[in-house]
């Protein structure tokens, strides 16, 4: 049974304390026992290897007990590590699932955005076509196609007259607005001066009255 590396530290701490209690050199035998447990696949192979190591300094009556104790502790450490590993795997799987769902949402939103963009472009294109058709129709109405006749020339003249009148009206309205603005400004200045003059007169009357007293 090969062991994960993460359980080696926990088991090694326990093993070192147990070897110290047996007055066995932990520096020599600790790493040796740990290596055997990690390399041997079956429980029987592990037990035989442990007995071969520990028989050098343990009596026969305690050898079996110590071997069983070491194997039991090793198995428990492996089980706890497996549970932690499974929990970690479950957490990793949950995070991966969440990331996948978020990625799907982003893709779906992007697809919706693309669809909305396409619909918008289609509407704009349709509107542009309609506008172009209307503009062409207006141009056809304003500028008759074909050989100019007296009637078409008369229509063109009328259109120009209307446009000129509108331009004159706009210019006149602009000029009137500017004049009104200047008049209002002048009136405000007059009102301001009149108000100041009244204040000055009132002030002078007050000063005269005080001097008479």
UniProtKB/Swiss-Prot annotation:
Feature: compositional bias, Acidic residues: 131-142
InterPro entries: CCDC43
Biased composition (Basic and acidic residues): 169-200
Positions with biased composition (Basic residues): 201-213
Region (Disordered): 127-213
Keyword presence, Coiled coil: yes
Organism: Danio rerio (Zebrafish)
Coiled coil regions in record: 119-206
PANTHER family: COILED-COIL DOMAIN-CONTAINING PROTEIN 43 (PTHR31684:SF2)
Family: Belongs to the CCDC43 family.
Keyword terms of this UniProt record: Coiled coil
Protein name: Coiled-coil domain-containing protein 43
Domain of life: Eukaryota
Keyword Flavoprotein belongs to the record: no
């Amino acid at each position: 049974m090969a062991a994960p590396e993460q359980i080696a530290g926990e088991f090694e701490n326990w093993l070192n304390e147990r070897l110290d209690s047996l007055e066995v050199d932990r520096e020599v035998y600790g790493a040796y026992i740990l290596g055997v447990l990690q390399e041997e696949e079956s429980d029987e192979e592990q037990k035989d290897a442990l007995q071969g190591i520990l028989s050098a300094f343990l009596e026969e009556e305690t050898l079996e007990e110590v071997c069983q104790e070491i194997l039991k502790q090793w198995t428990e450490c492996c089980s706890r590590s497996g549970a932690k590993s499974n929990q970690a795997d479950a957490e990793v799987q949950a995070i991966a699932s969440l990331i996948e769902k978020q990625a799907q949402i982003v893709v779906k939103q992007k697809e919706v955005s693309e669809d909305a963009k396409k619909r918008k472009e289609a509407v704009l294109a349709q509107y542009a076509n309609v506008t172009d058709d209307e503009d062409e129709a207006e141009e056809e109405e304003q500028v008759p196609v074909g050989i100019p006749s007296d009637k078409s020339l008369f229509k063109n003249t009328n259109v120009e007259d209307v446009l000129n009148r509108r331009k004159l009206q706009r210019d006149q309205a602009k000029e009137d607005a500017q004049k009104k603005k200047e008049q209002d400004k002048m009136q405000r200045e007059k009102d301001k001066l009149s108000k100041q003059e009244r204040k000055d007169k009132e002030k002078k009357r007050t000063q005269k009255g005080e001097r008479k007293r």
